Amino acid sequence: MSFQHCILGIVASAAAFGLSPASVQAGSFSISPLRADLSASAQTGALTLRNQEAAPVVVQAQAMLWEQADGQEQLTPTRDVLVNPAVFTLPANGSQLVRVALRRPADAQRELTYRLILTEVPQPASPDFTGLNVALRLSLPVFVAPSAAKAEPRLEWTADRTADGTLAITARNAGNAHARVINFSVAPAAGSAAAIPQDVTAYVLPGQARTWTLDKKHNETTSGTDWNQLRV
């Protein structure tokens, strides 16, 4: 059964369109900000890493082209973005400024998307160490605004019934900039059943789509004919 006629209107926080926390702490690091926003007039950006531990840490930084295809993330090494320094030692209880710089022109009509990958370089363990040495790896978005158009995401929502009877909700980004979906709710257009909330937290890059399948426990709830139209 197809559910193409949807009453649109995402029920989500403002973060659905790209807002994110200013900083995050992961393992022994804290990082601020959590993304870099570049443009034709602001071709460089900077992030600050802070070491919360009493021992130095070696970190490698690399820029990757960020694409999506069939709902899957694709990262490819790129020279479009310069990262400096590319390898550095983060002092004990110290900090390091990492700069990113655009090395190509911004696209006139569409946002460019990259990822800054920060990887901890594992150090040799002491002879008496018996634990698991886990290297930290973080991925931060780098966005480049179009030079001749306003950056605007535009999500188009559809719903379809899968072969096993579950509802699959798809958000297709018809805009020229990324959207960040935090959560959404699905309900029948007639309002005869309670809305089903979904927490997802995912980026939808321009021209791409993401699909979420509702848990099978909702099959019975969503099987009625009043779900021929949905509000998402």
Q: Model-derived features: where do they sit?
A:
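Bacterial N-terminal signal peptides that target proteins for export
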Residues: M1-V11
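Bacterial N-terminal signal peptides
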Residues: G9-S20
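Sec/Tat signal peptide C-region and signal peptidase I cleavage site
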Residues: S20-A26
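Beta-sheet-dominated interaction scaffolds and their linkers
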Residues: A26-Q52, K150-T166, T201
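Buried hydrophobic-core signal for structured, non-transmembrane domains
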Residues: G45-N51, N93, V100, R115-T119, ...
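Short acidic, flexible loop segments centered on an aromatic residue
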Residues: E53-L75, A174-S192
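Intrinsically disordered, low-complexity Pro/Gly/Ser/Thr-rich segments with frequent PxxP/GP/PP motifs
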Residues: E73-A106, A193-E220
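Terminal connector regions
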Residues: R103-A149, N219-V232
